[in-house]
Amino acid sequence: MNKRYLLLIILVLVASVLVNANTAPKQTQKETQMSDEIFITNENVNKVIDSLSKSIPEANLFRIERGAQQVASLWRKQDGTAQEYEAFCIENFVADNESLSQLFNKLERNFEIFNGYFHKIDLKLKEPLQLDGPAIQPIDMMFGGYDVSAHLNDDMYSSKIAFITALNFPFYSLDEKTELGNDWTRQEWAFARMGDRFISRVPAHLQQHISRTLTNADAYISDYNIYMGQLLNEEGDKLFPEDMKLITHWGLRDELKSNYADTENGLEKQRMVYKVMQRIVDQTIPQQVINDGTYEWDLENNKIYAEGKEVSATPELDKRYEVFLGNFHAMKQLDPYSTHYPTQLDRAFDGTMEVPKKDVEKLFTDLLSSPMVKEVAAFIESRLGRPLEPFDIWYNGFKSGGGVPEEELSAMTSKKYPNAGALEADLPRMLHELGWTKEKANEITSLITVDASRGAGHAWGASMRNDKAHLRTRIGENGMDYKGYNIAVHEFGHNVEQTITLNDVDYYMLSGVPNTSFTEAIAFLFQKRDLDLLGLKQTNPHDDYYLALDNFWSSFEIMGVSLVDIQVWEWMYANPDATPKQLKEAVMSIAKGVWNTYYADVLGGKDESLLGIYSHMIDYPLYLPNYPMGHLIDFQIEQQVKDKNMANEIERMLTQGSIIPQLWMKGAVGQEISIDPLLNATKEALDALR
């Protein structure tokens, strides 16, 4: 992913930014609310429709009606009188197809220019926050939180560009796209995406506030590191390397996974990581051990020591949930301006994912309730030779080469990739080994650059053709360890998708993929081949079986986490005045409820709150459901590319661009997103392996 972090050294700054964001613009907000009222009446709209209908062929009636209504919903008093609204619509409606295509081409070209260059500015301003380097200073936060494009939409409206776009390119709901889209030409799809461009009018000051809030959340998580070498077990021993510093939750999770290969201390280390996670979720973690290696931390008794002497520990209390709540309040402010998608949940599912929430939840609950869960759990238990524990939700023993100790893998990767430049130089080879021709591999990777990341790593695609995508990855002083390499291969998959769908899709308005689940699916395809790219490919006739089991267990893990995320957002909407403490209690209660319903019978740990550990909940509002959707899509794509050239198949699929997900899937694999292929393959795998 993209994404995507704690910044204790500037807590005072963060607080002041939030206070300023909430207090300074009060008068502006009041004035904006007054001027943001819709005042164009149905009578005005009907006048436009009647006037245009008399002079324009009937075939355009739908566009006339939809366009006049859409402009009316966006027109404000500062844009002109009701009579000026009517005159604008009548004068600027484009009826003939040739002129409409010319208008589209000009809009598309110029929107790419805006998107591309504003993106480059944003990327450069955030470098001090996201790239490895000197300590972050208050001025870095100020620039990093600045949204350079915040006033662009205002300018689009004041210049009337937004109105001419909304007038001539109608907005289609998800239901309408689903019903009509199968028969649309590529140009008609591009026109429909142009119609998505102006459907809400958000004030610039609000966009700036949201940008600052999300930047602060990103900074909070980016520096939420745990110094593992300072952890003490019940006997007072240290089991982790002295220099091991892991980001929450990604690094902790991956360390837990890696210890399945450690037959000596692996289980005890896993239980220690698990305890760290629990203390983060319930906020009993001492403030002093977050991003600070000064203190030894007795996990079981929650005591800290400096130079052998106990020091008073101060729990983090509810900071984690204060940040989470800040995201909710920021995103909720968009609700009044989003007529088509009136809540963040609507925007996340119908608007961004373009799969209805009820359909997503049904996919998740159907898999979580499947009889396959207990059967796969029993199979894992037989392999481990012990009863399963809650942290076995991250069991990764199905992966090819999973028995190779991580120390050996890290020795290979640190030697191969001592710095970001070494990884960047190796990208063409990696892509060629995955099936691309040398020429195409060089073409794609020439548009990808590698940066040393401050956080766990992410992929940041370009926004205009022939600009570079950025692969951000964590590289230590001694080179890239295996955890960093594994994440980097995942992010490389994102970058390849970003580059192909920007540069090889026929219309800029169709660039990208239907939603982030699809880029996650491509990233998973790459990530699971990370050992192949190290030359460790082992031909195993059971590989396909283990692939199915691995995907099933990964889906089982992240679907529950996603349900927690969804239910927490539903709870926040039902309790908008909640305090951070109340939110913490709600998150833990919801996490326990989901756990008891779907996990406790197979993993134990009744009333377990582990599902609340994911940093995405704090950092990326409602992003988590994209991961399990990505797993399902990934599995269906994996089956499609089996015994075929992976590069050719990926190119074929990706060049469909950003049509809606279910139509994309039909074009890619011949059926919609479904759990059935995964369940069938899982059953086949168990029958073969038991």
Predicted segment positions?
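Post-HExxH zinc-binding segment in Zn-dependent metallohydrolases
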Residues: 500-504, 508-551, 630, 670
